[in-house]
From Swiss-Prot:
Pfam families: Aminotran_1_2. GO terms for biological process: L-histidine biosynthetic process. CDD domains: AAT_like. This is Histidinol-phosphate aminotransferase. It is an enzyme of class 2 (transferase). NCBIfam families: hisC (TIGR01141). GO terms for molecular function: histidinol-phosphate transaminase activity; pyridoxal phosphate binding. Its cofactor is pyridoxal 5'-phosphate. InterPro entries: Aminotransferase_I/II_large, HisP_aminotrans, HistidinolP_aminotransfase, PyrdxlP-dep_Trfase, PyrdxlP-dep_Trfase_major, PyrdxlP-dep_Trfase_small. Its EC number is 2.6.1.9. Pathway: Amino-acid biosynthesis; L-histidine biosynthesis; L-histidine from 5-phospho-alpha-D-ribose 1-diphosphate: step 7/9. It comes from Cereibacter sphaeroides (strain ATCC 17029 / ATH 2.4.9).
Length: 361
């Protein structure tokens, strides 16, 4: 490439994103517990909608996503005019950075927050500002102290990935109230459905003009392979985001499958209950053999080892047993492994394999 052809500032500072591994060399049918996927997959009703969609693949999809937006609004008690749909919640995050950040502005997030916050900030030439957490949990005072007149966006995953920790409504309200006037608080609720009774920021959005939530169909809805997400916020902000959203950013298949998925809340409830049961079981089983974790409110636990060497050695042992988990050194947690909560058999396999590893040490 010619030296005269250069990308925009910040682009070359982006490290390539590495997703969870899917395969282990020499191991057939390895169990993937590295990407926080729903082990039960999507709702049967969503699968039926997916199959029906093949009959209209020659037609362009809806440009306003009305069917999906209204379904989301009905289920969550929202105003459909203030819902925006995208290619995963990642795209909503990208829209927010494109619309409100840029050169000479700051995008704030916590030190163990989702990697896409930094990537999206750098992609628009903004300055990423990483704020320390307290014991792997969001520190509201630290975030407020990091805000300046340059701050435009504050991203907060609640529950957080990869830690699984979360803060309560009072802290969220204090954070929203304490931000500079020009800043937007973005509450990333990718794992919100795993928390009973949690509104993921809906009440705050109705009370204030500086809060937006993002959500995804990739986790509890089991549609990670389709890439569908959505956002909700003040109408003025959503109108801005729609101006940069591509008119056909979601296919008919994505829209119809996601609509069927969100309407099947019985499936969601079953998945949430099963996840909670086996998340508690696995955390307790690992704690008994000297592998602690913080209380997780998501569909994974962050297992802590004595040091990086032990975590990496355990990961290698798990791979020999056909178990794929996620190293999280990229999140500044090299002594930890993130383990997706699978079904009962999966959780028992993980506990047995880690116990086997600890006995060999």
């Amino acid at each position: 490439m010619s030296d005269a052809i250069r990308p925009q500032p910040g682009i070359l500072d982006i490290a390539l994103y590495e997703g969870g591994k899917s395969h282990v060399a020499g191991i057939q049918n390895a169990l993937k517990l590295s990407s926080n996927e729903n082990p039960f997959g999507p709702s049967p009703k969503a699968k039926e909608a997916f199959l029906r969609s093949v009959h209209t693949l020659h037609r362009y999809p809806s440009t306003d996503h009305a069917g999906l937006r209204h379904a989301i609004a009905e289920v969550h008690g929202l105003d459909p005019a203030r819902v925006i749909c995208g290619v995963g919640s990642d795209e909503i995050i990208t829209f927010l950075c494109q619309a409100y950040a840029g050169p000479h502005t700051d995008v704030v997030f916590t030190e163990h927050g989702f990697l896409m916050y930094r990537i999206s900030a750098l992609a628009v030439g903004a300055n990423p500002v990483e704020v320390p957490e307290r014991e792997r949990t969001t520190d509201v005072d630290a975030i407020l102290a990091a805000c300046t007149p340059h701050t435009r966006l504050v991203f907060l995953a609640n529950p957080n990935n990869p830690t699984g920790t979360m803060i309560g409504q009072a802290d969220l309200a204090r954070l929203a109230a304490g931000l500079p006037a020009q800043a937007i608080l973005v509450l990333d609720g990718a794992y919100a459905e795993y928390v009973p009774g949690y509104d993921a920021g809906r009440a705050l959005i109705e009370e204030r003009g500086n809060v937006v939530m993002t959500r995804t169909f990739s986790k509890i809805y089991g549609l990670g392979g389709l890439r569908v997400g959505w956002g909700y916020g003040p109408k003025a902000i959503i109108d801005v985001l729609n101006r940069i959203r591509g008119p056909f950013n979601l296919s008919t298949t994505q829209l119809e499958t996601a609509e069927a998925a969100v309407r099947d809340q019985d499936h969601v409830a079953r998945c949430r209950a099963d996840n909670a049961r086996w998340r508690i079981w696995l955390a307790e089983a690992l704690a008994e053999i000297g592998v602690p974790s913080d209380t997780s409110m998501a569909n994974f636990i962050l297992a802590r080892f004595s040091d990086t060497e032990e975590a990496e050695a355990c990961d290698l042992h798990l791979q020999t047993q056909g178990l794929i988990v996620r190293r999280v050194a990229g999140y500044k947690l090299p002594h930890c492994l993130r383990i997706t909560i699978g079904d009962e058999a999966s959780c028992r396999r993980v506990a047995h394999a880690i116990g086997q590893f600890k006995r060999m040490r």
